[in-house]
Design a protein with these regions (language model features):
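Flexible, glycine-/charge-rich segments associated with ATP-binding catalytic modules
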Residues: 1-31, 92, 97-98, 196-200, ...
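Amphipathic alpha-helical interaction surfaces in cytosolic regulatory modules
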Residues: 8-91
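A generic structural signal for beta-strand entry/edge sites
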Residues: 36, 174-178, 268
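Short, well-structured alpha-helical interface segments that form or flank functional binding sites
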Residues: 50, 137-144, 148, 176, ...
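Conserved ATP-binding N-box helix of the HATPase_c
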Residues: 58, 134-170, 228-234
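P-loop NTPase nucleotide-binding core
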Residues: 80-112
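Helix-loop-beta hinge of the Bergerat
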Residues: 104-134, 189, 196-214, 230-232
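ATP-lid-like helix-loop hinge signature
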Residues: 152-193, 256
């Protein structure tokens, strides 16, 4: 007989301390085996679409551990979000909704899906209206950066897939797009501390990984370069980069790294990139980054 677990979702789930803490709590509470889990959305009236990447990774983990789960009490706004970004059609019998230009559909990639991942990010993110203008070379280099961030998550996390989902918010006071990449694997904290033989906190290990040139990679693969390029784009664009891993949550905003305090532990890595839409800057590549073998 399966144990029934009721999970009540908060009123608003957004990419902030409370939102990431909720997912960390959720992973800790429900990723046991042989349960029947009901996700109750009756009080939840907002759920950032890009965070479906985290929920999807958690649900796949539940399935692997012989749990079954159901959704109930959906309010219209979260329901529409989950329907339009294809999340519901993956996890329920809902028919696939028409593709919506304001969503970056829920997707997961394997390590060997490099081409598929780059095509997906290019089409779903950079080819959409309102995105920052970039030269061909700059766009290629930024795509590599984003892919490097994803692949780092996979190879370092030693997990099977990286999960991705995104949402355009053209009607916000400051219109923006958010895209999240998630893997429930090893944490940045474990990787960096193993590499350095240290006992740094979650935040300090994320800051170490964000420092140009630092990498836990071995062999000839470059590390750190992609992140630097991505940080530059985010700073010029006035967007933000959030990284959550273990007990760490660091956010790059307005050229400053903000360290947040997490109550709960996330056993993997979440990376959320936010870019402002309608940016009047045009981006070109100032240095000759090796952009061969990208596409």
């Amino acid at each position: 007989l399966k144990t029934i677990i009721d999970v009540k979702l908060p009123v608003r789930i957004i990419g902030d301390e409370n939102g990431y803490d909720f997912f960390s709590y959720l992973v800790g509470e429900i990723t046991t085996s042989d349960n029947e889990i009901w996700f109750d959305f009756s009080e939840c009236n907002w759920f950032d679409g890009n965070l479906c990447a985290i929920l999807g990774n958690i649900l796949d983990t539940l399935k692997q551990r012989n749990n079954i789960f159901f959704f109930k009490g959906f309010q219209s706004t979260p329901y529409n979000t989950f329907s339009r970004n294809k999340f519901l059609s993956v996890f329920t019998d809902e028919p696939i909704a028409e593709l919506d230009s304001l969503t970056i559909p829920y997707q997961k990639f394997k390590l060997e899906d490099e081409q598929k991942a780059k095509d997906f990010i290019k089409e779903q993110l950079f080819d959409k209206p309102g995105m920052p203008k970039m030269s061909f070379e700059a766009k290629k280099a930024i795509l590599v950066s984003i892919f490097e961030v994803c692949v780092n998550a996979i190879t370092h996390g030693q997990c099977d897939h990286v999960y991705c989902c995104g949402q355009f918010f053209p009607n916000k006071k400051t219109p923006e797009v958010s895209i999240s990449f998630v893997d429930l694997g090893r944490t940045i904290k474990a990787n960096v501390n193993d590499h350095l033989g240290s006992h740094l906190t979650g935040n300090k290990t994320i800051l170490w990984a964000l420092d140009e040139g630092n990498t836990t990679k071995t062999g000839n693969e470059p590390g750190g370069l992609g992140l630097k390029l991505l940080q530059n784009l985010i700073n010029y664009n006035n967007g933000s980069l959030q990284i959550v891993s273990a007990d760490g949550f660091v956010e790059l905003k307005k050229h400053v790294f903000i360290e947040h305090a997490m109550k709960n532990y996330f056993p993997g890595t979440i990376i959320t990139i936010k870019l402002l839409l309608g940016d009047s800057n045009s981006y070109i590549l100032s240095t000759d980054v090796d952009t061969e073998n990208i596409f």
